[in-house]
Amino acid sequence: MMRISKLAMLAAAIFVAAPVSALELKAADVHPEGYPNIVAMQNLGKKLAAATNSRLTMKMFPNMVLGDEKSMIEQAQAGGIDIVRTSLGPFGPVVPEVNVFNMPFLFRDEAHMRAVIDGPIGDEILAKITASSANLVGLGWMDSGTRNVFTKKPIRKPADLAGQKIRMMGNPLFVDTMNAMGGSGISMGMAELYSSLQTGVVDGAENNEPTFETQNYYTVNKFYNHTGHLIIPEVFVFSKTSWNKLNAEDQALIKKLSKEAQQEQRKLWDAKVLQSRAKMKAEGVTTVTDVDKAAFFQATQPVRDKYGKDFTALIARIQAVK
C-alpha cells in the first residue's frame, strides 16, 4: 500500500508540474482586415497572449472566411469557433430582451446607446445571453453606429420607399420595421447582398457608414439616406462549449480584456466613420441628410408597440439613462 501511495504521489507531482498545453482560440467576423471590430479583437488576442505567456493565443478569421453570421454562430454553439462578433438579430428568438435593443428609434443617439451598454442594463443583457439556451457566453459589446437606408434614389420620407425591396437582417422585427417605414423588407444574408444589389433582387439595404464603404456597396447604390432608424450595439460571444474547458482564472482574464476591447473598439469606430464618410464623398455618393425622421418615427410606432409590450419596464429604464 505504501508503494502504491508513493507512486500515486509521484504521478500527481508530475501532473502538477507538467506545463498546461497551449491553446489557440479561433475568432471570426464577417468584416475585413482593418475594420474596428477586427482590430479590437486582434488586440485582445495580443493582450491575452502576453498575459498568459502565449499559453492562450487567438487567431482571427475575418471577412466571412468561416461563413456569414448565422453560420458562425452555429459553429460557435457547436464549439467549432471560440469567439464571434455578431449582430443582435439572431439572439432575439432565444433572449427576448435582446429585441428591445433592436427596436427602431429606441436610442436618442449613439451616446445614449453607449451609456446603456456600458451600464447595468448592458451587463444584464449579456448575462441573459449567457444563461440562455444559445450555448454562448456574452463577453461584451461593440459599437455599430447608426444604420441608414442606401438606395439608387434619394429617400426623404416613407412614401419614397414605396415599391423598394430593402434587404434587412434575418429577424422578423427588422423586416417589420422596413415594412412600417414604407418599403418591402427582405430577409437576406450579408454574403448574398452585393450580387443581389447588382442584379436587382433587392433595390437597397441599410447599414452603417463603415460597412457601406468597406463592403463597396457604394459602387452599386449611390444614395446614402440618413433615416437613422436603428442604432444597435453588437455583441461578441464565446462558445460555452469552449468556455467550460477554461479554468476560472482564464475566464476572468478574458472577461477583463473583453471590457477593454469594448472601449478600444469605440475609439477605432469613431475614427473609421470619419474615414468612411471621406471615402464615400470621394466616390460620388450622395448623402441625403434632409430626411423627415419624425415621419419615420411615427410610422414605426406599431413596431415598438408590438415588440416592446412585454418590456415596458426595461424600455423605461433605457430611456431614463442620461
Where are these regions (language model features)?
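Bacterial N-terminal signal peptides that target proteins for export
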Residues: 1-9
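N-terminal secretory/targeting leader peptides
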Residues: 11, 23-113, 121, 129-322
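Sec/Tat signal peptide C-region and signal peptidase I cleavage site
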Residues: 16-22
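Hydrophobic helical h-region of N-terminal Sec-dependent signal peptides
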Residues: 9-16
